[in-house]
Amino acid sequence: MTKTTRLTPGDKAPAFTLPDADGNNVSLADYRGRRVIVYFYPAASTPGCTKQACDFRDNLGDFTTAGLNVVGISPDKPEKLATFRDAQGLTFPLLSDPDREVLTAWGAYGEKQMYGKTVQGVIRSTFVVDEDGKIVVAQYNVKATGHVAKLRRDLSV
C-alpha cells in the first residue's frame, strides 16, 4: 500500500490538465488569477459523493459571489461524470482522473481506513487554491455530509 504525501497551506498546488465530463481539457492554470475550490471524491453517483456534489451545487452562488470557483475530481470516466452531472444538475466542472495521477499528486489517493480496514483508495479531500496557485486550505478525510457548510464557515462565505 502507498502512503501519500499530504499538501499543506503555503504549498504550490500541483498542476493538472484533465478531461471534463464532455471530454474537454481543463487545467488548474485556467484558474490563474482566481480562487478555486478543488475537491476530490471517490465515485460519481454514490450516496456520499452525490450528497457532497449537491451541497456544492446548492451553495455555488454564494461561493461564486465570494470569488470562488468549484472543480470536482474523481477517477470516473468522462461518460459517467456526464451522466452524474446531468442527473444532479451540476453546473461546475467535474474532471476525470482514471489513472489517479492527479489524485496522488494532491495526496488524495492512498491508504485510508474503511470499515476498520486499511485499504487503498480515494481520500475525500478539499483544497482552496489562491489566485497565485498556492494552497490556502487543505482538508483530508472530510465527511460528505456537512463538509460544505463547514467550508463556508471556515471561509466566511
Swiss-Prot record:
The keyword Disulfide bond applies. One of its GO terms (cellular component) is plasma membrane. It holds the Pfam family AhpC-TSA. It comes from the Bacteria. Keywords: Antioxidant, Disulfide bond, Isopeptide bond, Oxidoreductase, Peroxidase, Redox-active center, Ubl conjugation. It is an enzyme of class 1 (oxidoreductase). GO terms for biological process: cell redox homeostasis; cellular response to oxidative stress. Its EC number is 1.11.1.24. There is a cross-link at K12, K150 (Isoglutamyl lysine isopeptide (Lys-Gln) (interchain with Q-Cter in protein Pup)). GO terms for molecular function: thioredoxin peroxidase activity. Residues 7-157 form the Thioredoxin domain. The active site is at C49 (cysteine sulfenic acid (-soh) intermediate). It catalyses: a hydroperoxide + [thioredoxin]-dithiol = an alcohol + [thioredoxin]-disulfide + H2O. Disulfide bonds join C49-C54. Thiol-specific peroxidase that catalyzes the reduction of hydrogen peroxide and organic hydroperoxides to water and alcohols, respectively. Plays a role in cell protection against oxidative stress by detoxifying peroxides and as sensor of hydrogen peroxide-mediated signaling events. The active site is a conserved redox-active cysteine residue, the peroxidatic cysteine (C(P)), which makes the nucleophilic attack on the peroxide substrate. The peroxide oxidizes the C(P)-SH to cysteine sulfenic acid (C(P)-SOH), which then reacts with another cysteine residue, the resolving cysteine (C(R)), to form a disulfide bridge. The disulfide is subsequently reduced by an appropriate electron donor to complete the catalytic cycle. In this atypical 2-Cys peroxiredoxin, C(R) is present in the same subunit to form an intramolecular disulfide. Belongs to the peroxiredoxin family. BCP/PrxQ subfamily. Monomer. This is Putative peroxiredoxin Rv2521. It comes from Mycobacterium tuberculosis (strain ATCC 25618 / H37Rv).
